[in-house]
Amino acid sequence: MTTDSTTYDAIVVGSGISGGWAAKELTEKGLRVLLLERGRNVEHIKDYVNATKGPWEYLHRGRRTVSMEEKYQVLRRDLLNETNLAYWVNEQDSPYTETKRYDWFRAYQVGGRSLVWGRQSYRWSDFDFTANARDGIAVDWPIRYEELAPWYDHVERHAGISGSREGLAQLPDGQFQPPMALNCGEELVAERLKKGFGGNRRLIIGRTANATRALEGRTACQYRDACWLGCIFGGYFSTQSSTLPAAMKTGRLTLKPWSIVTEILYDKEQRKASGVRVIDAVTEQTIDYSAKIVFVCASALNSAWLLMRSATDVWPEGLGSSSGELGHNVMDHHFRVGAAGRIEGLEDKAIEGRRPNGIYVPRYRNLFGDKRSYLRGFGYQGGAGRSDWSRAVAELGIGAAAKEEAATPGAWRFGATAFGETLPNHANHIALDHTRKDKWGLPVLKMDCALGENERLMRKDMANDMAEMLEHCGLKDISTYDAEYFPGAGIHEMGTARMGRDPKTSVLNAHNQVWDAKNVFVTDGACMTSSACQNPSLTYMAITARAADFAVAELKRGNL
C-alpha cells in the first residue's frame, strides 16, 4: 500500500452526472480537486468510435448476438446491442446478487451514464418536496423547492435544457433554450387533449438536455437521434461535453480513472473523514488519498456500497449507518405500461429529421382535488410517428404491389408509456454480500427490492388513462399494455442514504452532509427522500451544485 503525499481540498468519487457537477463547482470556487473514477477514461469526441457509423458498418449490423447474451446476462434484459456495448459494465468482473430480481444497468467509465442517459430534464415542485410530510410516508424532505430553484436555474443554463414554458404548478418552468417542435400527430393530440378533462391533462414537448442553441465548446443538437453512441458535436449534456471541460479549464482538477474507491478513511478523534482508500483497477495496487472534504457521487447503489464499506468500530455497519437507514428505501420509476393508437387524417403529412426527444404529459393524478385509491402519480413519455417500409417485410410480398407498399409511408400512430412514482419503503434495501466477491476481491451488493401495493394500484390508471385520452382525441385501434417491470429497469435508482431533518431517521442533513461525518457529502441519487415521477437527473445536478456551494463556504469558515 502507498500513500499519496498530496492533500487535496476535495475528493469527488464518481464522474457521472453528479460527480461531474461536483468537480466543476468545487474547482470553479477555488478548490484543488481529485476526481476518482473506477472505470476507463473516455475522451470527448476521440473515443466516440461508433458515433458516425451506420448499421451496415457493424459486424452484426448493430444487433445483439448469442455470445453477447451469454456474457451480459443483465444487459440482455433490455439494452443489449452491438452499437454501444463498450459503455456498459463488464458483468463478469462486477457481478451482484439478486435476492429478488433487480435490473442494474451500470456504466463504469469517465462520464458514467451521462454518456448514455435519456436526457429528459424536469424540475420537481413543492408537490414533490412536501409529499412525504403530507402523506405521512417515510420522513420529510429537509428542503423545499424555493431553496433549490436558484440552483435549478444555475445548472439549466450551463447544461443547456430545451423546453417550453407552460406555467404548470406541478412542473415548474426553467431557464430553457428554445423548445424542439411537436410533429403534426403530436400537435393533433395536444390540441384535442386541451379541450377535455377539465384542462388538467396537457401534452408538451419533452424538456431535454439537448441544446437547441450552441454553448461554449458545444454545437447545437444535429437531430441525429444517435445520442447513445456519444455525440461528437457536444449536442447533449454529458460530463465530457460540459462539466469536465469547465473543471479542467480551472487548472485545479486531477482526474484519475481506473481508481476503485473501496472505503472512506475516518478519523475518530476528529470525527470526520481524512480521505479515501483506492484500488488501482489495473495494477491492483492500494493507494490512500487525503482531502479536507469528500463528495460521494458514485450513483445511488454504489455510493451506499462505499458508505457500508467504510465501517469502523465507531460505525460497524458503515459510515452514515447510525440511523439504521443506510442502504434502505431503494426507489426507481416503474414503467412499461401505457397505450397506443392510430391517428386518422394525416396521411398527407410526413416527418423530417430525427428529433432526439419525445412528448411529456405531466402528472395530474392526486393533484388539484383529484383523489385516487393510491398515493402520488405518474407522467407519460412517448410520441407520434409513421411506420416505415419495414412493416411490409412480414408480408413477404413480391412484385410491383409489394414495392409500392414498401415505398409508401404507413399509418400515423401515437404511443406513450407512463413513469410512476415509487414510495420509499424501508423493506426495499441493499446490503453487502460477503459470500460473493468481484474481480478485485470486494464484496458485491445484494438486492432485495419489489413493487408495493401502491405501485400496483397505480399501474391500472397508467394504462387506462392513456387509452381514455387517446379515445377522447379520436384515435382508432387503441390498445393498452402492461409489460413486466422489475425494480432498477427505469435506471432512476434513488434512496439508500436519504436526506432528512433528524439523524435518528436519515443518513444526510439538509446540505447533504453525512450526519456521522460532516465533511462527507452525498449528492447523487442516494440522497433522495422520495422519488416523484419526473426524471431525477436535473435534481441531482441542482442538489450537487447547492451542496458544493455550502461545502466551500463552510471550508472557508473553518467548519470542516
Please report, for each region that a protein language model flagged, where it lies by residue.
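N-terminal glycine-rich phosphate/pyrophosphate-binding loop and immediately adjacent elements
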Residues: 2-132, 137, 142, 146, ...
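Aromatic-residue-lined binding/catalytic grooves and analogous aromatic/hydrophobic interfacial grooves
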Residues: 20, 234, 239, 355, ...
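Glycine-rich loop(s) and the adjacent beta-strand/alpha-helix scaffold that form part
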Residues: 28, 32, 37-57, 250, ...
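Short, glycine/acidic-rich hinge or "gate" loops at secondary-structure transitions
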Residues: 44-47, 162-174, 476-485, 557-560
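Conserved redox-cofactor binding core of oxidoreductases
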Residues: 59-66, 70-103, 108-109, 118-123, ...
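FAD cofactor-binding and catalytic pocket of flavoenzymes
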Residues: 85-106, 110-113, 117-118, 123, ...
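A glycine-rich dinucleotide-binding beta-alpha-beta segment and adjacent secondary-structure elements
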Residues: 204-211, 220-227, 262-265, 411-422, ...
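A conserved FAD-binding loop/helix module that cradles the flavin
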Residues: 530-548
